[in-house]
Amino acid sequence: MRNHCIASHFLPPILIILLGILISSPIVLCSEEYTENSQAQVSAKGANGFRLITPANLGGQVYLEVWDEDDCLVKFKIWARADAQEKAKKFTDMVELELDREEEVVNLKLTTPHPAPWEGSNYGINATLYIFIPHNFTVETKTQAFDLDITGPITKIDIQNQYGNILVSDISEETSITATYGQVDVENVRGSLNVETSYNSISVRNVDTKDEKALLKTSYGKIDVERFEGQLEASTVYSPIDASDITLIDGKNEFKTVYSKIDLDITEMKDAQLYVQNTYGNVNLVVPEDLSARLKFTVGRGGKIITRGIIIRPTVLNQTSLEGICGKEESEIEVDINGIGQIQLEGK
């Protein structure tokens, strides 16, 4: 009988390492999958809110949008993988969907056993929800490991999500998003906006706070703002902030980061206060050439302050600071760089 084993000295070293990993790892080499589809529907006539709750040991995707009916409709797909199809089906049977009505709120809840047999294993399970609700509802979610894609028109939304990305659009009054390790994208929002995540980015577009305020906070993630009007506070660390086409109105606005850069392109300022803080990073400001504001710029030793395309009447000017007046002092801009960095102010 011929020996079909391959001598190790004929294999590249990297292949030997990979084979060793495959042999030593508890991988499900023969896996079977099972998928089940279902749907549920409940009357939402007279209701004004929707609430979603999912367990910690189940992840997937949620797609929520509005429709013209007076019902809430949920289309549900559950997928599982195990070493046998019978076991995979057993996993899907363990996930229960409950859709009911409690006075003015429609509740959708997914439940699973705890602990579940797929936890800590190489088995897999994933849920996909397609949710349809009436126009101008309020929405509340408490999820983990779900990616959320939510489109209005919705009046108010309150999202709490861990380990998943979030996309929200078309909110008319109030938006509150608390995430962990998830990217957050928000667009077409009116009213107050509060977004907090960590170790990922925040992007907001086409926002008007309507006499309210927007608060954007992350760490180790970039903040992007485009087409904004109102009051804005944005903070991150070790990552840049880029805001363009922004109008700052009646109140305090703050931008903070460290060891990165801040780029602000301001279309208009109306009786607003702008405070920018950075550490060992540059700050670039583009403002209207007819800006009316009091300026105060400070950098650390070795830093630079550059201005162009705008008329400033200086009151203090030295190697590390510039104070001055543009126009009638209707607004205030203060920029402080702790350590070496450059402030550049450009009129357009």
Residue spans of the language-model regions?
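Intrinsically disordered, low-complexity terminal regions
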Residues: 2-348
